[in-house]
Regions:
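Acidic/glycine-rich phosphate/pyrophosphate-binding loops and surrounding catalytic core
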Residues: 2-199
Length: 199
């Protein structure tokens, strides 16, 4: 289940589809035709592992981690000890993983990459949200995201307590200096924007 995904511009169905696509792409990039090193481990060898935080953070990306391991091996079991959006401490155990050693070894890097990237975004957002607490200001994101991780990073912003300004070019007008220069003047582009809005 996606936590904190109730923002009206981020339907959970689209986010879930995005997670699947991102995870499949990441695994294809990292694993390719197979994990040569993991194949050195006996195929029936089982293992247990834990993900432990190295520093304080806001946890974000649980669904991506689950999807990474599930994509490699649906039989890998993950028991989470924290919830999405929780503020965790250094050395805190986040989850315990069990299953075939090969599967755990193959999926771990992709899973950790998503967890670290999204938790970093959520953590930094939470820092700024706390800094403006008590004011009328609001922390909003931009489109300056890592390519192919737009939905993921914007989701992480909401987990950190921020808001989504717009998801992409198709769902809102945001006039910048380059648009004004291309249109010829502020008046010209505002006229076009008002005409677009009236339609």
């Amino acid at each position: 289940m996606i936590a904190n995904s109730s923002h009206p511009s981020m339907p959970s169905s689209e986010l879930m589809a995005s997670i699947k696509q991102q995870v499949q792409s990441a695994i294809a990039e990292d694993v390719g035709s197979g994990d040569l090193t993991a194949q050195l481990v006996p195929s029936t060898q089982t293992a247990k592992a834990s993900i432990i935080a190295r520093e304080t953070a806001v946890i974000c990306g649980i669904d991506w981690v689950n999807a990474c391991f599930s994509e490699i091996d649906p039989n890998v079991k993950i028991d989470w000890l924290v919830e999405e959006g929780a503020e965790i401490k250094a050395e805190q155990v986040l989850c315990e993983i069990s299953g075939l050693a090969r599967s755990i070894l193959t999926a771990e890097r992709c899973a950790l990459n998503f967890l670290q990237t999204l938790s970093a975004t959520a953590t930094q957002t939470r820092h700024y949200v706390k800094a403006i607490a008590g004011t009328k200001s609001q922390i909003l994101d931009t489109r300056k995201t890592i390519p192919n991780l737009r939905w993921a990073q914007k989701y992480a912003v909401t987990v950190g307590g921020g808001g989504n300004q717009r998801l992409a070019l198709y769902d809102g007008v945001l006039i910048k200096e380059n648009h004004i220069a291309a249109a010829g003047s502020i008046a010209a582009i505002l006229k076009q924007a008002l005409a677009l809005n009236s339609n």
